[in-house]
Amino acid sequence: MVNVQSFEEDKIQLISIHLLDVENDSYMNLFWALEDAIQEINSNVSSAVVLVDLSDVILKPKSLGVGYEFYFISDLISGIKFPTIGIVDSEAHLALLELFLCFDIRITNRKSRFSMSHILEGFTPTDGGTQRLPRIVGVGRAMDLLLTGRCFSAEEAMEMGVVQYLFPKDVVGEAIALGSQIAAHGPIAAQYLKEAIMNGADMTLSQGLSLETDLNVILQSTFDRAEGIQSFLNKKSPKFLGR
């Protein structure tokens, strides 16, 4: 149900989720297994970036029963302190698209299709669809997608900012390559960048700038910052340790 693979000395963590049975018990078992996996990854000092493959996931909120709304997988994903990359190599509709939107970077197959067609079944998004989607694509486009429930292509998703990368094949392999690029940089700096962007988005510009300054000051005291400076002066590649 939840499989974790590590690459490049644990810097890249790949979580593959398998949920094709949408009954409530299966969902809850997945939730607890994923929670354990994420806690372990967050406590691993070697971790730098987390990839999550959602290609074998089906989520239909109406079939999950009472209690689903209190156990959102998206809350677990949002609690990952490292940069996250969401992977969909098929299609993402309804709650699966809502979950997909909570990742920092999203990649998909060129043939993928998406929709938030909750309204066609007489209900509304329950996992952030009405909040994350307009923040990503804008209010007007979100209104269109949510009120019509229409399907849209991977190309349109790319144009709107729903996804950042399209690949014709081997989407997981391409995601690992992207993760490798991110993991090669300072892991603490990457965490602080994520914190500044995600938290700053809900602040005024002045508050966001103050947060950016505070995180920069904290970063100055780390080993990785000193390593970066010394490597630049000595014209060699830095060896970041995440401390």
Q: What function would you assign to each model-found segment?
A:
Residues 99, 104-105, 144, 148-150, ...:
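Well-ordered beta-strand positions
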Residues 71-125:
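Glycine-rich beta-to-alpha active-site loop
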Residues 130-140:
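Hydrophobic, secondary-structure "cap" segments at the distal end of domains
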Residues 107-112, 154, 163-210, 217, ...:
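C-terminal long alpha-helix characteristic of the crotonase
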Residues 15, 34, 52, 100, ...:
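Terminal peptide-recognition signature
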